[in-house]
From Swiss-Prot:
The modification N6-(pyridoxal phosphate)lysine is found at K107. This is Biosynthetic arginine decarboxylase. Disulfide bonds: none annotated. The lineage of its organism: Bacteria, Bacillati, Cyanobacteriota, Cyanophyceae, Acaryochloridales. It comes from Thermosynechococcus vestitus (strain NIES-2133 / IAM M-273 / BP-1). Its cofactor is Mg(2+); pyridoxal 5'-phosphate. It comes from the Bacteria. Keywords: Decarboxylase, Lyase, Magnesium, Metal-binding, Polyamine biosynthesis, Pyridoxal phosphate, Spermidine biosynthesis. Substrate binds at L289, D290, V291, G292, G293, G294, L295, G296, V297, D298, Y299. SUPFAM superfamilies: Alanine racemase C-terminal domain-like (SSF50621), PLP-binding barrel (SSF51419). The keyword Lyase applies. HAMAP family: SpeA. It catalyses: L-arginine + H(+) = agmatine + CO2. One of its GO terms (molecular function) is metal ion binding. Its EC number is 4.1.1.19.
Length: 637
């Protein structure tokens, strides 16, 4: 293992680009300008960019406090355009006779302004929506107004869900009910007959092809959703017996939310193509093939099959889907179906950037120790001698010695043979040894396994104005990696190594895994914190799933969110969605602000009567309490 090598020459923005890998995960939307600030180009390579640091400062001048979620509508539009353009090129290249009609899975980001923008941007492509629950179906019915767009109805379904989806046909929706559980078949038949409306029905297949990584269990015989091949055949016969086989028009599969290897996609397409052909042979009126999600996001910029990356481009993906289904249909002499993908992660991730500030830093002491004297305890003299002797020839042995002496010092203290000042002296010497050893280790091409954790042990803790549980729950829950970096000072060398600790009173409220080249780093390169000066960090590619899955741990609520649109003169704020106030989050757990305030007022009156508080103090307390109820749940800068 090689530790981060510290440069001794003058630092440049090119060094920062390489260190934070922004050209890998950020293209074509994010870069670094000559001022050392992160820039965002919401329209990709079509021109126009904003200085992210200057944008954040301008928003703060408008009383929009950090932490802050920036949503760039132009990026959302660009993602839809790119996805449709990739499929259009693939269709033209392979002479595919069907069309492509994408849908956005609402579960990826249910925010109203996001869905409104997606529907608007997708109109020219007949881009539709996918619902995975009854509430999401209600959103889709109301928001989707694009003629010819598809409404894919997934998830668990009761009679009410099925009735709503079928009745939506009367509003002109092309609503397709995807059968995912065996019992849904009879329910759809019964509801259809009761309403006198023939639905469009699909089946979700449990492919034997499985993805890799943490989403690999989305497919396979024991997947949560879908029908096995025998269950699909049973569904076909049930529909045939009811005289409704003509309603079966779609095959759907899903092999995972983030597929890192293109080979997995190819295998799934091959298997699905054969199932589709067999359904045609059995007499179903097949028209659509829904390849589900899986189009990945390159979170670490490595372009590999690492779980935080993908070894293919969007064009590779589209071409393999089109070519695979084209081959399957040509073999059987059947028409090419309309292709559907549910590429929510690939569409929504890039448009959101989470900005937060550093509140303070806890560092390992960086001191040159005073020489040990003959009067000091032997363990202290041993630690100092170890420190003095450290060089590039013995740094591994010295580290093991320092660990041993530190352990002995703690044992001596616990048995009463060392005083508290002596223990403090021993610990300071131990950290001085570690700092000296780490300085040598960073210059080596190879570092022994014994020293792999040294970088993390010596890392500073940067306290951030954020709740990991609220804003990046996947970082905590499934160890997902997101690109994180400073948005300014990138013309300076980041000489510190740190982890990020959030505001919650929970030891899990931290981020201590960071992107690396096809690997995971335990520390992030950061700049020295300057008290009194703002230090802003950005977390990128977090537009899918994070907002809705966040929770209220310690009652930290939603952050402020600003929708930004590029204009010829700069930018405009399309929407400002204020984050939760303390009164709002207290309401979520059944506390009423007025009732709480009244309780405090009664207590202050009682304290006044007992002369425990002055009138001025009571007034100050009440004003502060009332102001706090109306305030943001996060710390003010």
């Amino acid at each position: 293992m090689a530790l981060t090598v510290t440069k001794t020459s003058n630092w440049t923005i090119e060094d920062s680009e390489q260190l934070y890998r922004i050209q890998g995960w950020g293209e074509p939307y994010f870069g670094i300008n000559a001022a050392g600030h992160v820039t965002v180009s919401p329209k990709g390579d079509r021109g126009g960019s904003l200085d992210l640091y200057e944008l954040v400062q301008a928003l703060q001048q408008r009383n929009i406090s950090l932490p802050l979620l920036l949503r760039f509508s132009d990026i959302l539009e660009d993602r839809i355009e790119r996805l449709n353009a990739c499929f259009a090129r693939a269709i033209a290249r392979y002479g595919y006779q069907g069309a492509y009609k994408g849908v956005f899975p609402i579960k990826c980001n249910q925010q109203r302004h996001i869905i409104e923008a997606l529907v608007r941007f997708g109109q020219s492509h007949q881009f539709g929506l996918e619902a995975g629950s009854k509430p999401e179906l209600l959103i889709a019915l109301a928001m989707l107004n694009t003629p010819g767009a598809l409404l894919i109805c997934n998830g668990y379904k009761d009679r009410s869900y099925i009735e709503t989806a079928i009745l939506a046909r009367r509003l002109g929706h092309t609503s397709i009910i995807v059968l995912e559980q065996p019992e849904e078949v009879a329910e759809v038949i019964a509801v259809s007959q009761a309403l006198g409306i023939e639905p469009i029905v699909g089946v979700r297949a449990k492919l034997s092809t499985q993805g890799v990584g943490r989403w690999g269990t989305s497919a396979g015989d024991r997947a949560k959703f879908g029908l096995t091949v025998p269950e699909i055949l049973t569904a076909v016969e049930q529909l045939r017996a009811a005289g409704m086989l003509n309603a079966l028009q779609l095959l759907h599969f899903h092999i995972g939310s983030q597929i890192s290897a293109i080979s997995v996609i190819k295998d799934a397409i091959r298997e699905a193509g054969q199932i589709y052909g067999e359904l045609v042979r059995l007499g179903a009126n097949m028209q659509y093939l829904d390849v589900g999600g899986g189009l990945g996001v390159d979170y670490d910029g490595s372009k590999t099959n690492f779980h935080a990356s993908k070894n293919y481009s969007m064009q590779n993906y589209a071409s393999d889907v089109v070519a695979g289904i084209k081959d399957a249909c040509r073999q059987r002499g059947i028409p090419d179906p309309t292709l559907i993908s549910e590429s929510g992660r690939a569409i929504a991730s890039h448009q959101s950037v989470l900005i937060f500030n550093v509140l303070g830093v806890s560092e390992v002491p960086k001191i040159t120790p005073e020489p040990a004297t003959a009067e000091e305890h032997l363990i202290i003299r041993n630690l100092y001698d170890t420190y003095q002797a450290i060089d590039e020839n013995n740094y591994q042995e010295a580290y093991n010695d320092a660990l041993q002496f530190k352990g002995e010092a703690i044992s001596l203290f616990n048995f009463g043979y060392l005083s508290l000042p002596e223990r403090a002296r021993a610990e300071s010497l131990f950290w001085a040894c570690c700092a000296k050893i780490l300085g040598i280790a960073r210059q080596q091409e190879y570092v022994p396994d014994d020293l792999e954790d040294l970088e993390k042990i010596m890392a500073s803790i940067y306290y951030i104005n954020l709740s990991v549980f609220q804003s990046v729950p996947d970082s905590w829950a499934i160890d997902q990696l997101f690109p994180i970096m400073p948005i300014h000072r990138l013309d300076e060398e980041p000489t510190e190594r740190g982890i990020l600790a959030d505001l919650t009173c929970d030891s899990d409220g931290k981020i201590d895994q960071f992107i690396d080249l096809r690997d995971v780093k335990s520390v992030l390169e950061l700049h020295p914190f300057r008290p009194g000066e703002p230090y802003y960090l950005g977390l990128f590619l977090n537009g899918a799933y994070q907002e809705i899955m966040g929770n209220l741990h310690n009652l930290f609520g939603d952050t402020n969110a600003v929708h930004i649109r590029l204009t010829p003169k700069g930018y405009e704020i399309e929407h400002l969605v204020r984050g939760d106030t303390m009164q709002e989050v207290l309401g979520y757990v059944q506390y009423q602000g007025d009732a709480l305030l009244e309780k405090i007022r009664c207590r202050t009156e009682a304290a006044l009567a007992e002369e425990q508080i002055t009138l001025a103090e009571a007034q100050h307390l009440l004003e502060n309490y009332e102001r706090s109820l109306r305030s943001y749940t996060y710390l003010s800068s």
